[in-house]
Amino acid sequence: MTSTFLRSFVLGCLLISTSLFAAAQRFRAIVPYVNEGGKLIVSLKVNGQQGRFLLDTGAPCCVSHEFATRIGLKAGEMRTGEDSNGRAVQASLVSLDSLQLGAVTFRNIQAMQWEKGNPTAQLIDGILGYNLLRMGIVKWDTRQRQFIFTTLTEGLGLDPSRALPLLPNDYVPMVAVRLGKTANDTVMFDSGAEGFYEMSNRQRERLTKSRSTARILSTADGTLSMGASGIEGVTTKHRILIPQMEIAHFRFADVATITTDGTASRLGSQLFNYGDVAIDFPRRTFYFLPHPAQKEPLKVYQPEWEVVPTITADGTIVAGIVWNAKLPICQGDRIVEINGKRCERIDFAKAVSTPPFLLSGKKTEIVFIPQGSTEERRLTIHCK
């Protein structure tokens, strides 16, 4: 298993109205995408200027302050929304005269402009989000590494036996997945999230009251993710093992999840490891199209490090969460060396696009300094 400096870097969901849609009624845009650490990124043009945009069904169209300045956009009224960790966030509303994806051009698209200096701008220029995507059919062809946005169903290979109805929601795609034989969870398909499945604490509370086969592996206080408003605060998290999970009538086994304080559970981009995904927004249908080699039930267990390092805004690395309470390290203790590489101070902005370290294998050695101390201590941590 490989782990980066943040468990997830998920951009928040600001609810804005549906954009004006001035392209032809029938269209098909096909563009290649690149996968950078679970983030699927395409190249497109806004007002004639090239940019790198994240494909994100969990957020509206967005542009960075730097990209907006470069193409001469003027910020409009402020809007308030909620980020992926459930915290309030504000951004300015802007209008994009044109957005060209492949051979198709869309006109008068609303977007949100991030604040100046947002570290996300080190990685991408913006987001291609739900307020445009919901006007057609989207498909991620994972074997060809292509993203398709179209109004035409022909040639998409949609299989009704692998379909789920979209649940009522004016913004993001929501579906019901089955957990075991009796429990269900209402989840957002968030292509901008790195993980496979993140369970909301609300769902965990419901499961504890039912006779679910889901099992809590460990509980700890800590921080693991970043939303549009920055790194989340310290909260209680649970690592849960779900023996069986069904998505669009395809069965997965041994699903490990970490709870989130977001308003809804999420399916993320790791689902693309096992098949294609298509969403027919006009016909309110979600498809998971497993790769032919995948056999049911498909085991997707992911081991977890006993200590998860997290980078802070001031450039230090700390123990974001400690799952093994028997270890001498505590949440918040500073980490100054990983795998023999010193990491006393990290450029936070650069670390967003280039993770400063990787954790790999089944064990590694770290050097940490307990809070209130100056003494460095060595510790071997395991991934299991």
What positions do the PLM features span?
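Bacterial N-terminal signal peptides that target proteins for export
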Residues: 1-13
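Pepsin/retropepsin-fold aspartyl endopeptidases
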Residues: 22-384
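N-terminal signal peptide c-region/cleavage motif recognized by signal peptidases
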Residues: 17-19
